[in-house]
Amino acid sequence: MSTDAGRGQLADTYVAALQHDLVDLPPETTLVGVVRSPTPWFHATVDENLPALGPPANLLESTKAAEEDLKVQGLCAEGAHNAAWDRVDFGERYREHLETDEEARTALESLATRLESGESLALVCFENTETKRCHRTILRERLEQERA
């Protein structure tokens, strides 16, 4: 979590950590989902969701296909997930989405403004980044760059 005088704190976590009380966030933190197609139980865990900041559908589909192919080749679930990211150039494509998609840019600017005004935010997705790569880490880096 980063702290700047007069500015909100920024964190990221995954939904299961919130559901099982595995993460320590200040009580005033707004839980912002960044999931393209959230489940009802995801909605029940977060305060809001910004689907525009989730990876675009075509990127999710190509990553899932690569992941399944890698599992067939014998990689474990986590290994296949992480290798699929490299295979489809996930990071580069997601960063491009944040730059070129009007809804994503608007949502990103809104989060940056909220942080500047003092609101503390935690970006929430499904992946435990101790074992799997997740777009929310890229999103957090982007927000931190805008704050610098």
Predicted regions and their residues:
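Residues lining hydrophobic/aromatic ligand-binding pockets adjacent to catalytic sites
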Residues: 2-148
